[in-house]
Each structure stands twice: as structure tokens, then as C-alpha cells.
Amino acid sequence: MPKTSFASLRLLALMSASVGVLAMAAPAMAEDEAVEAVVVTAPRYVPNGETTASKSQTPLVEVPQSVTVISRDQIDLLDWSTLGQVVRYTAGVTGENYGPDQRVDWLTVRGFNPVQYIDGLQAAVGSISNTGLDLYGSESVEVLKGPSSVLYGSTPPGGIVNITSRRPEDKFGGEIEVQGGNFDHKQFNFDVTGPLGDSVAARFTGLYRDKGSQIDGVDAQRIYIAPAVTFRPTDATRITLLSYFQSDDVKGDSRGFLPTSGTLTANPLGRTSSHTNLGEKTYNRFQRDHGAVGYDVEHKLGDGLSIQQNLKVTHLESDDRGLFASSVLADNRTVSRYSFSFGENVDVFAVDTRVKYRGDTGALRHDLVAGLDYRRYDYVGSSAFVFGSPNTDLFNPVQGLKITAPPLVVFSDQLQKQTGLYLQDQIKLDKWIATLAVRHDWVETTNRMAAGAKVEDKEFSYRAGLSYLFDNGLVPYVAYSKSFQPVAGSTFSGALFKPTTGEQYEAGVKFDARGLPPGVKLFATLAAFNLTQQNVSTPDAAHTGFSIQTGEVEVKGLEAEVVGRINERVSFNASYTYTDSEVTKSNGPDLGNRLPMTPKHKVSALVDYTFQDGPFAGFGASFGGRYTSETAGNLLGAFAPVIYQNVAVTLWDASVHYDLNDWKLAVTASNLFDKEYVASCSPAANCFYGTRRVVTASIARKF
């Protein structure tokens, strides 16, 4: 490891230790400092309330599962707008795996790609498991780590990511903001909420962004709006109508596809710039529209009993076309290219109805949820793939060619219906909490390209956990959980594939600030886990070209995470992740391989300080660092005879901000020292530079 990496690690370790010292010193600081005039800039920096992890009223500290909640205040601190950005300081999660992408977010959670949910219901995801939803309209982002099928049905074993939308508030308020930055970044956004009467409140959020990229010739526009209304016809009834619409138009983006020669490996003619665009600026284009309408209704029946229903109708359509690098020829500079076009139409209808009960039976306290959910997923995908597109020069790309888009051919036309019935009871006896949950799913998948051929799957999921609540806020827990995901395909004999299954054992400790002085807000989690995925497809040694489901993947790890805030002055985040992933059973060459984009080590720490009095009152600054160890870019396979190892990297972030009355000025910088690095390489022409330095200045008027 280079000396600079050791130095970066030492500095990160010092920062993490400093955060630990802050956490331990918090009680003394809270008692010693008498805060008179407080400039409240991030009152909800530290999460402590309910989450989608339990679909109940259970506090986060009492949920026997590792869950990270990134609050709106955390998102605002460093001006994050994508899921890849918000998980930079989160344990167990890696983001921005393929560098800057104007379309979607690339994440791994405990080694697997998570599925995106919005307000507790699955989003209209297509071939990629998220929609690229802009986070300006979100109140928080929740990462549920580990199998979550017991409450959400078919999900990956690594977990899910849920985005919670901003909701109407009874008090009038909002903001208008203008931003500008490098790469021609220009943005205007607004958020306004308030009462429309005694029992009605509304919210309207919107954004327009026009920006380029570190890749030459890229121009991306985004429009986002999100109206919402809440009705309270009675004290016992709340009806919230939620909606959003987002439109993206990205021109000229080659997605950063570059050959390994000149990026990860040496090229005798020199190094390829991270600004290189090997596509065709006038031809490459990505367009997407997606939106949703729905509601969240809750009615309290009395005596601890309530009923709640979430419903959402979502539509997504996208068109993508471009020229992309294929390989470097013998002269080390001529690059062959291919043309790829892709389109998707996705419609999702999802509804989740649950009855909640909180009450006592003798010495036992129950927090019970019984629910029925249904999801209808309609997907049509089409593509065109053509080799023999005009070559270009690696170091002086040719632009201005006229390219004719090939006609699209439908490759997938399917309808999937999933119905789930679930029951969970969190039983409290004195300071003990037992969490028991069970679910049964019925999944029907219809392939409309095969004369309506249907596949029906049935699956049980379970979760069991045990926690103990100490008076000082310390909560140790153990838990077991299962997950499943349907798989398309069949064996040589014609037997349909079974769903893949996930199984996890987890033990950990959580801590909140209930035992600390009022000025201290703190939440910490330490978790160890062993996660196994089974029924993984692997080559059938007896029948070439076919697969059988005898493969297995195992992921073991340790995650530590803390977020805190002291006397409205100091905010901090720190995390450490150790992940050991391996393909433990396979008939292919990937046996023993580590999972792609799953580093063994990830360390991060961030500290922000805001002055509360004196001549600098309202002024604040933050500084953070994040280290990711080397990762594998791919598994070995028929089209990937070599594993490309992505090098370890340390990046730094910073911000300065100033609050004066109702105005806020801020400057944020990610990758502060503009480190050029390769984020990922898989096959020989699939290398992606990581995100270079991004600087954004903003001025906001709050009201």
C-alpha cells in the first residue's frame, strides 16, 4: 500500500477516534456549556423515531436488525442528491460503484444490490433495481440491512433501501434555493408547506437542474415536482395524498466506459483522461419519465388498535441509446465500438394494508402488526445491439458522426403478481423484547413472450429476534431472518428454477441517548452477521449451456456506526465495515471469488461544527474522510476470464455554511483534493473513473 494510503488511514483513524471521544465527552460538554442563543441548523440530524423496518410504532433502537436512517439534515449538510452519495458514511453499503452516473444509483448492501422502495412500497424498477429518484423530495433514506422478506416479500438477501417522501406540515414554512457549481451545474429548487385550513395541510416541492459531467460533452436536465396534501377529517383519521413526477434528459453521456488499457493498466502511449468521452456526443442520449400517485391512510380505532393502508400507482418509461467502447486495437489507441439501444416500460400497482395493535395481555406488552400486501408488476423491455460501429481514437476521440439508431426488439414482456400475508408481534416483558414474525407469499409470473407461460412460487419467510433494554440506552440483540427472490429459467430437464433464498444470523448492540443529558443526541449500532444465499444458478456440468441451482454465496461481516449531535454545535458521523464475501459453491470458475464491489474494509468519519454565539454565530464548517479498500470488479466467467481488482482509495469532503436570520449560504466539496481514480473495472472495456471533485455553492431563503 502506498505511503499516502497509510497516511490517509491514520488520519481517518484519528478522525474516527475523535468522533468516539466526542461521543464519550458528550455528557460533560452538555453539562458544562450553557447555551443561550441557539442557532438551530439541523434539529433532526440524529434519527430516533419509527422506521419502515418494523411497520409499527417501535423505536429504532428496539428493532433487532441493523438499520441506518439518513435524515434530511444529514442529506442537506453535504448537498447530497443521489442514493450513491448519501451512503458515503454508512456502514455495510457502497455506492457510486461505477463513477458519476446521471441516470441511476449503483449500490451494494452486504454484497448484494438492494431494491428501492418509496414510502414503504416497491418502486417501478426495471433492469436496474432503482429509479434514480432525486432526493430533494425526500425526508429520509432508510437502509434495512439483511433479509427483509418477512415484511416486504421478494427482496435481495442484502437488504432494501426505502426513500420516505416529505410530508405536509401544519406550520407554514419552506425554502427557495439557487445553486451553481463546476461542470456547469445550475439548479433552482423550492419547498413550501403549511395549513390550508383547520384540517388540511399541503406541501409542494420542485426542482430544476441543468448540469454537465466530468465526461466531456455531457449535458443533463432534470425536472422534479412533488405535490402532497394531508386531510384530518377527525382526530382519529389521517389521509395523506402523495405524488411525484421526474423527467430526465441526458445528452452525450458515454457513461464513462473506457478500456482497461490506459486506466487500470498501463498504455505505452499514456494515460486516458477521466474526461474522455468515447461515445458520440450528438447521438448518445438517455431519456426517462417516471412518476407516482398514491396515499397513506391511518385510522385509530381506539384501545391501541389502528388500521393503515399505503397505496401507490407508479409508471416509468425510458429510452437509452449510445455508442460505447468495445476494445483497444493493437496500435494501443484505436478503439472499436458498438451501438446499444435500450428501452423500458414499467407499471407497478402496490397496496399494503395492516392492522396495528399496541396493548397489554397480563405482564406482556404487545406491538403487533398483521398485514396483507399486493403488488402487480408489469414490465416490457426492448433492446438493440450492433457491433461494427465506427472506430474512434482513445486519446483524440472523433465526434460529429451521423449514427442511425437500430430498431428495438422486445426481449422481455412479463407480468408478475405477488400477494403476501404477514404477522409480527414484538412482545415486551420487563426489559426483554422478543420479535417474532412470519409471512407467506404467493408469486405468479407470466411470460407473455411464451404464449402466456406462468410460473407460480410459494414461499414462507421468518424473522425472530431477542433484545434487552438497559436503562442507559444500551440494547444488545440477536436475530435470525430469511428472504427469497423468484428466478426465471429452467434446468435441462425442464424443471422451473426455484426462488433463491437468503438466511442470516445477526448479533449486535444499539445505543441511543436516553441516558444522556438533553443537549446530546446520539445513535450507535454495532452488528456482526453471517449471511448465506442459496439456490444460486451455476453451470450444469453434465449439460453444456444449462444451469442448476446448487450454487451458494456467503457473506460475513462486522459493522459499526454512530451519528450524533451535541448542543446544536457539533454533528458527527463515523462508521467501519468489515465484509468477507465468497462464492462457496459453484460449478464455474467463480468458486472462491469475492463478490464484486464489496470491499473488505470501509472506514469513514465526518465532523461538523457550528458557532452559536459571538461574531461567528451561525457560521459552520465540516470535514470528512472515507476509505474503501480494494474491490473485485467482477466474478470469473465465460466472458470475464480475468478478475480486475480496483485499487483502494481515500477521499475527502468538506463544507462551509453560514446561517443569518432566514438566509443560508453554503459551499460544499466532495473529493476535495480532486483525486483521479478508477472506481471499477470488469470486462476489458468496462472501466469507470470515480467522481472527481464536485464543488457547489448555494444560497437559500428560508421562511
Regions found by a protein language model. Give the residues of each.
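Gram-negative outer-membrane beta-barrel transporters
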Residues: 431, 523, 527-530, 549-636, ...
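Face-selective signature of the C-terminal outer-membrane beta-barrel domain
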Residues: 293-316, 338-448
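Membrane-embedded beta-barrel scaffold of Gram-negative outer-membrane proteins
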Residues: 296-302, 306-312, 316-322, 501-565, ...
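Acidic, small-polar-rich N-terminal luminal/periplasmic segments of exported/outer-membrane proteins
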Residues: 33-171, 507
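Outer-membrane beta-barrel translocator/receptor signature
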Residues: 136-139, 150-227, 233-237, 291, ...
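C-terminal beta-signal and adjacent terminal beta-strands/loops
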Residues: 572, 626-638, 657-703
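Structural signature of Gram-negative outer-membrane beta-barrels, strongest in the C-terminal barrel
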Residues: 230-234, 346, 365-369, 373-377, ...
